[in-house]
Amino acid sequence: MSDSKIVDTAARSSTASRDSARPEGRRARRGASTLSPGDKVFLGFTTGSALLIMVILAGVAIFLIVKALPAIVADWPTNSELHAGPTLAFGSFWAYVAPLLWGTLWVSAIAILIATPVAIGIALFISHYSPRRLAGVLGSLVDLLAAVPSVVFGLWGIIVIRPFLRPLGDFLNHYLGWIPLFAGQPSTTGSTILAGSVVLAVMILPIITSISREVFLQTPRLNEEAALALGATQWEMIRLAVFPYARSGMVSAVLLGLGRALGETMAIALIISPSIIFSSRILTEGSNSQTIAANIALNFPIATSLQRDALIGTGLLLFVVSFGVNILARYILGATGPGAASRRTRRANKAALSA
């Protein structure tokens, strides 16, 4: 048979298969559109619930914008109401919010640096090293850790972490005080950025651990067995087969943990002795950068009307930053994480059938 006949036969068979598939697709779509009354009620309920979430989110954003505008556009140097309390000595709204944003990002970054290697280590142990029964127990404990209230973590930080880290702070300042990070007079009470970051790291540990564990478990078994069959050790198999597959998932887990850290309030407010300044020191007391959430919690009850608008404005900035971080994490996990390729294949097949 000639090449032209083969191509013609293949084209006819492809056309026939598409023609035979189209009626089935149309029947399936017609069947899906013919819903019973109960299904229609349930569909309306679920659709309304999804729309309600969007309405609530939009309502929160509109509220924050409307309440923050008076403080954002106010003339701070000439407004007497802004020359007292939490807004004293600031020439504009942006001069007020900039050190708060720095403090929020600084504390969260240190917490992420502490929590990420520990969380990934726990996730690897649960998914690849521990016995099945122990893995179940450890997984449950990690999930339960996420349910502990923030104020409990704050009290634990005051009673346990601050006294525990005080000698470490003296040691770091004595031997590494020439580094700006450890410079300054060490705190005598332990109310430092380091203590707050350690507590915050423990609080975000369950998020990073749980997501990383699930991503590690989704690594194709054939990839792992192929690496082991080539003579790789357990660690080499993880490094060559698991980590490349789970890289985007780990990044998303870290970003979601960062989103939690950015909005944490009570633990930071209880532990750190802050000021609204730019500071990178982690061992000092009284000259620590304040976070947005803790500043709102501490000053909102005593603030005047316009000062509250300024605090709400800082909350608007935190809302935007946290929302952006979470969207980025979801996008990375959905676009390049485990299952993304299969989802793209399903969408391509569906498009081909409907063509």
Which residues are covered by each model-predicted region?
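Glycine-rich helix-loop "coupling/hinge" segments at transmembrane-helix boundaries
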Residues: 261-305
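Transmembrane-helix boundary motif in ABC transporter permease subunits
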Residues: 111-142, 329-338
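Transmembrane alpha-helical segments of polytopic membrane transport and secretion proteins
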Residues: 1-50, 329-355
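Transmembrane alpha-helices
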Residues: 144, 148, 208-215, 219, ...
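Transmembrane alpha-helix signature in integral membrane proteins
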Residues: 95-125, 254, 323
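Periplasmic/extracellular loop-to-transmembrane helix junction in inner-membrane transport proteins
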Residues: 28-45, 64-111, 131, 186, ...
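C-terminal transmembrane helix and the adjacent membrane-cytosol boundary/short C-terminal tail
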Residues: 213-221, 228, 297-355
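Membrane-interfacial helix termini and adjacent extracytoplasmic/periplasmic loops
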Residues: 74-98, 153-202, 273, 283-286
